[in-house]
């Protein structure tokens, strides 16, 4: 069996991940600029790419399993070891390319996570500063009325 189907799926995965990387970089700029509508559109597009990546990856796993004879080690490295010639070189190049794109995507997503966390912290702090605290430390009739009668101290006990 030829590794052509695996090569085609890896090419598709590389393209999809590169598009996802571009969207993640756009998301970084939208987060920095505070553009919520643009961010919402980007998230919708990201979901579509994630679904396509998931489907392609499932297909790749099935194809890899069939190519390797349904072994437990259904990895691209195992496919590279089983192939030779131009297919082997192409698989190695695609593997390296996909690894690099995934590494960059991981870094960009980590930065986006940090930007989102910082924005949420800022919103939380701003909200806490604008909203008054519920605890009122002033004396009032309501506090006096809540005290039980037995806890009142008397200076002079007339029954003694």
Swiss-Prot record:
Keyword Phosphoprotein set for record: yes
Name of the molecule in the record: Uncharacterized protein YvyG
Matching SUPFAM superfamilies: FlgN-like
Function: May be involved in the assembly, structure, or function of the flagellum. May polymerize to form a filamentous structure that is part of the flagellum.
Keywords: Bacterial flagellum biogenesis, Phosphoprotein
GO biological process: bacterial-type flagellum assembly
InterPro entries (UniProt xref): FlgN-like, FlgN-like_sf
Residue numbers bearing the Phosphotyrosine modification: 49
Pfam family for this entry, one: FlgN
Gene3D superfamilies cross-referenced by the UniProt entry: FlgN-like
Gene that specifies this protein: yvyG
Domain of life: Bacteria
């Amino acid at each position: 069996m030829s590794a052509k189907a695996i090569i085609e799926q890896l090419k598709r995965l590389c393209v999809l991940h590169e598009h996802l990387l571009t969207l993640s970089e756009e998301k970084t700029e939208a987060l920095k600029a505070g553009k919520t509508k643009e961010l919402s559109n980007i998230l919708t597009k990201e979901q579509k790419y994630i679904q396509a990546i998931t489907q392609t990856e499932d297909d790749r796993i099935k194809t890899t399993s069939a190519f390797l004879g349904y072994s437990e080690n259904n990895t691209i490295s195992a496919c590279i070891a089983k192939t030779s010639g131009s297919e082997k070189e192409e698989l190695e190049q695609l593997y390296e390319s996909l690894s690099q794109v995934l590494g960059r995507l991981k870094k960009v997503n980590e930065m986006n996570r940090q930007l989102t966390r910082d924005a949420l912290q800022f919103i939380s702090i701003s909200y806490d500063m604008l909203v008054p605290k519920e605890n009122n430390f002033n004396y009032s009739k309501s506090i006096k009325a809540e005290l039980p009668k037995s806890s009142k101290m008397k200076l002079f006990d007339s029954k003694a």
